[in-house]
Amino acid sequence: MIGPSLTAFPQPRTCEAARDAAGRCYILPVENLFHPLLQEWFERRFGRPTQAQALGWPAIALGRHTLISAPTGSGKTLAAFLICIDRLIKAALDGTLQDISQAVYVSPLKALSNDVHANLQVPLDEIRDLARNRSVEIPEIRIAVRTGDTPAHERQARARKPPHIWITTPESLYILLTSASGRRGLAGVRTLILDEIHAVAGGKRGSHLSISVERLCVLAGAPITRIGLSATQRPIEEVARFLVGTENLDPQGRPLCEIVNIGYGRAMDLAVEIPEGELGPIATNALWDETIARVAELASVHRTTLVFANTRRLVERVAHQLSRLMGEENVAPHHGSLSRQTRLRVERRLKQGELKVCVATASLELGIDIGAIDLVCQLGTPRSIGILLQRVGRSGHWLGGVTKGRLFPLTRDELIESAALLYAVRRGELDRLSIPAWPLDILSQQIVAICSAETWKTDDLYRLIRRAYPYRELPRESFDAVVHLLSTGIAGRLGYRSSFLHLDGVHDVVRGRRGARIAALTSGGAIPDNADYDVILEPDGTRVGTVFEDFAVESMTGDVFLLGNSAWRIRKIERGRVLVEDARGQAPNVPFWIGEAPARTSELSTCVSIVRQAIADRLHDRNGCIRWLCDNAGLPEPAAAAAWAYVSEGKRVLSAVPTDRRVIAERFFDESGGMQLILHAPFGSRINRAWGLALRKRFCRSFDFELQAAATEDGINLSLGPQHSFPLEDVFQFLRSHQVEETLAQAVLSSPLFSVRWRWTLTRALALLRFSGGRRIPPQIQRMRADDLLAAIFPAQAGCQDNRMSPDIDIPDHPLVFETLRDCLHEALDSDGLREVLRCLERGEIELLARDTAMPSVFSHQILNAMPYAFLDDAPLEERRARAVFMRRVLPEESSDLGKLSPDAIQSASEDAWPEVRDAEELHDALVGLVVF
């Protein structure tokens, strides 16, 4: 592996690589790599190569698969492209340049695709101008973007005359590989570049892409050089395996790939900002105003500031507030629910330095080149070490630039998490990449796409799929089950549906039926559909963006809402569309979108526990604790003092601090007479949600009562009634590691999570189509059809509970049910992590404490105020028993007096409990009501 220890850059005329994995050293002069025109242009423009370029070019020139892992601003993109451009220029000058695509660049974001297209077109134009000055005419080298935003007329033009370089997304590459015209244009591809590969490898989108890559290699019929570009990852070898596939692994499983691992060597200026007012369990309006004012103050002394928020609703709110402080012309939002034209306009203004502030979700998280950004602000926490590095890396996006980021925690728990983030960054910690194992819904979709283009022998098809790294361990019986499902379809009340393949058992071949290709083209992809309504500006019909279905349905004609930092008045709501007009100057509502909140990574959760324990160990020495937080977690003194005070107040009530080595059960009364049980367990929401669902199921069966429950990154809340009495220590014995997955599976089946994931699985497997007859199927119809398919495949789940003979639901052996449950247990939740936690409890490796308290500790305040995304049941916000807890604010030294009662109060309560008896009947009633026989 080529490592970051090579810090000396080579001179402009040579490009030297270090020793490869086998210890061999090779040196290739630059003049042997590039055409003189390209070499001259590069030296004029850049002077000399960056380390990523110097170490990557020789391997790429030799046709080796290459993974370049380096921070933003290190020249990764040009390192990947320049050899390819050089070959195209040489072929153009030799007269051998053909009208076929020779390179494909894939990025996970549309914005990144548009940015790379612009950044490639400029060098090509400059090289052609340089050639003209040398009296040399270079034929046109065509570059084209193909994404979901590409207009139909452009797609048709590219089908007739393919570009030499395709710039696309995973979904559009899949469409090109499935359509007849796209396949013809891709047959000559010899270079494949996968940018920001780490951003997709850990999800089903990456599994989908991995099969598309293998399909491209088969279509090309010749070796394709695979080039991967990645941020710093752990383990980097796993990313390399994902890049090259199983056909390019040695017998020991090592990737046959040149790994250029530069590491994260950029200078960083990261800090935490807290308001002067006290942080609490939720962000108050006063705190918000102070935070937004501070962001505006920082933005005013920087060229361009990029502000990240975790939700689209928050993006719109922050952009609106900042525009009131800084002027509407200086602020713009950017997120996926804005129209293509709006997003492109914001990106162009950013690149040209016309915006002071852009507020974005993850839509601008990856490597779009915006050189003017010199500050990144993160509102709340990103829940991930890697995402923090990715986001703050948008600043100083030039060679030698300094990464500058400011974190704005909005609650006390986010303050501790922000400290843990900076602690992790200072120590070079990274989130561990985990690649999902052979997802069957993606497999189903890709098999339909593959077989709709040509006939395959089933054995050959199985071998092709297993070449994709996520499918390296795909069991043959699972593959056969999916093929059988696609060939027979799903039996329903109206006959069989979703039968896309014809399986010839005699000749062992499979081919697509009529309609298979259309279904694969119009309903493919790994990203689940959102139930969104288009927002259309009248009278010109311009698409402004989208809003969530529930928001559209709950709105009325005349309502004013915010989208894209502009106010719109609703004129009419139609099926799937909201017709609007400009409402500039009127006070708008902020729309909402519903989705799953990002979960904190296990590596960051570990760092949260380290920081908590470090504070707990130094509570006796306030100044020493503050110094430790300043030195090791990068907190300013006011933030460090606030962290010390928070942990100190919590320990005063619980006598200990919860960490990943110490779980505390806390129980207290609420105002309704019931009790709230809090499990303080900072394992992250994926483990805690699994734990909470399983506990809720056990409580339901033990007490015959459906509990309200919630789970956050740092704990679990169970709302108990007056009848739920048990020794508090018993809560740790309710679940055992050897049976928790079965209990959790039953809990998931009765939760809203299963129905959502079921619909996603059906859509990805093409059992539930997104389009039919050229029109999009409305979300409400999709939900109805998903329910019908559930009744056909899994009648026990869809049936009436009163007719069940057993409390457990028998789970059928069906690939779609299997995949949905696996999604719930291992993607949305972390059942493996929960099992390991329970094993540690059973082995005594985690300390267990039980505390009945007179008042809730400050550690419980955030979960008691949890928002709906944390709920584990379907009770609405206004009916939550946790909201009946009175969280009074007292000084810590006064908290010990909360359980004391005055003698007068005791006498008054006694008189109320034992009524005055005046005759025999009243004595009888008193004895019946108060005495237990």
Task: Pin down the residues of each PLM region.
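Short beta-strand-centered aromatic/proline hotspots
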Residues: 566-573
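Short, solvent-exposed secondary-structure boundary/capping segments
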Residues: 574-591
